[in-house]
Swiss-Prot record:
Organism: Mus musculus (Mouse)
Identification of the protein by name: Semaphorin-3C
Ig-like C2-type domain ranges (all copies): 571-655
Description of how the protein assembles with itself and partners: Interacts with PLXND1.
Keyword Signal part of the UniProt annotation: yes
Compartment(s) of residence: Secreted
Amino acid sequence: MAFRAICVLVGVFICSICVRGSSQPQARVYLTFDELRETKTSEYFSLSHQQLDYRILLMDEDQDRIYVGSKDHILSLNINNISQEPLSVFWPASTIKVEECKMAGKDPTHGCGNFVRVIQTFNRTHLYVCGSGAFSPVCTYLNRGRRSEDQVFMIDSKCESGKGRCSFNPNVNTVSVMINEELFSGMYIDFMGTDAAIFRSLTKRNAVRTDQHNSKWLSEPMFVDAHVIPDGTDPNDAKVYFFFKERLTDNNRSTKQIHSMIARICPNDTGGQRSLVNKWTTFLKARLVCSVTDEDGPETHFDELEDVFLLETDNPRTTLVYGIFTTSSSVFKGSAVCVYHLSDIQTVFNGPFAHKEGPNHQLISYQGRIPYPRPGTCPGGAFTPNMRTTKDFPDDVVTFIRNHPLMYNSIYPIHRRPLIVRIGTDYKYTKIAVDRVNAADGRYHVLFLGTDRGTVQKVVVLPTNSSASGELILEELEVFKNHVPITTMKISSKKQQLYVSSNEGVSQVSLHRCHIYGTACADCCLARDPYCAWDGHSCSRFYPTGKRRSRRQDVRHGNPLTQCRGFNLKAYRNAAEIVQYGVRNNSTFLECAPKSPQASIKWLLQKDKDRRKEVKLNERIIATSQGLLIRSVQDSDQGLYHCIATENSFKQTIAKINFKVLDSEMVAVVTDKWSPWTWAGSVRALPFHPKDILGAFSHSEMQLINQYCKDTRQQQQLGEEPQKMRGDYGKLKALINSRKSRNRRNQLPES
């Protein structure tokens, strides 16, 4: 029974190894929430044990504050240490609104509260904040003081309606930007959640919105993000870009499919004079594509945009747009990261317009005359210096925009394929942040990818020989105790910190923790983390301005042979030899766990002084990610096993195991609970002398016996009663006699 139980446990262990050892790339280092806290590179904040739906809505590096919205609370956290006592404002929905919300059948816990969804900088002293208000949106001004030292954080004005500024439903995302004390929002404007709009409010000018109930403009959108992006050198040509996904009817007009989109408008758009009054006259949109083309032709689309990050440069046209996409298919679960050049996006918006033609309303490129100024052009910009407002636009320009808001060409990622693809994993990506890092051998982009399981993956983008780029997962961190989806993520390159939120709270994580890779130069070099380098003593933070000659870093190739000469590399590559015993016809496991799952493992066997030969794998001998399983040990398995790990052409011996095979009968007798070995204090009861027993076994077998005796002595020291003399000596006596005769045959003459 004991042997059967062991077999079952080994089987479960192997199954778990097989599940973990999928074809998907794995992180070099995985840290649980508690392990991450032990590194002292993270902080955590939560108001209570309740789920309050935290959202990081604004980061102010000048005042060293992080502004967080949650259910009934507005929080101001210290950007250097979020676990310090926060400044907070309790801002619940009115009792009447909460009761009305419940009467309407809304969720009392996750709907009938004031979920803060908008926090924008209004001026030097005030923030503008909006909440769902128990399905009755409300906004107000919050005084934060001129300096962070003022410790001022309070609402000092009356609340006003948030309609057109914040969605009624807290589970429907609201996106916003503030420009010159004007709020641009993407949200749903009604209680029922049927009227979506991109809205300009909080303005001394007239309020402007998208054309109402016009599916050509917006069709059941789910807003993701919004950004102000320059377009040329003239500030009047800047655009507000809205990223969203929407349900569009296919050509058969029978089903709706989800597509990711980008829309843009001019901030100085005041609407049309006779048509599109108080509606955008510069609204255009284009489809955002993230797909993988199979070898046989068809495309697998990642249709649902989840998050966007803009990696800005000194030249706005070279800005990169990173997007997280997921599949809308119910067949498989997948995520992808696609990267776009801003210049490619702007080229599509300057390209042909889409036009529906024919009985099937097929989309084609519009071939008619394009009115002047080109639809989508901002008034007062480089191309329209004489037009002060959009009310000066000719009627044909406004009419064209109303009927042709969609661009014909779609926006494709760099190299027309995703940078990262994950299919068949137990997680999906939800959020992204990107940092640009200067290393010894170049500049690298490091991606921080939040998942729906409460982890953050740190991924470095590596150049390859082809036109595409490779990627390597450096770390995966559990930033929350429970596996809850990550809702927002902000990065501060200045502070070298990442800020992450979920339903449960907010976490702060350093962008690097170099010491976790290991204590040797080779470990540090193989990690290929652009934040880290070997300084001659440890793996530590790399500073490009440093002039220390002992700094060792090779992100591009990760080759310790060229970087770690003189740092005890030879000793590092050899492992100490250990002895392990196995029992004939039983199972055994030779453990060999490489420091990195990115290393490949090969087993070599050396018998006596013969050359090492690679272990042949079969149904009896199985290699796993954690070691070598021998399902039925044979005498031929005895020898010295070498576990060789290879990573980036660098080989090292992870384990040396001198494996010795024991006789099953001897082990059964020695380990039997009724064995005479348990009667160490009752020698007189034995029908033969103990020396006869000791002489019956080989040196290696005696090592096992000595260990058994040691365990017995420890039991006696703990005060346990010695077991009574019982058992059958016949089997033991026969074994002793056979061993005696064998030992006499093999005994060397005394010298």
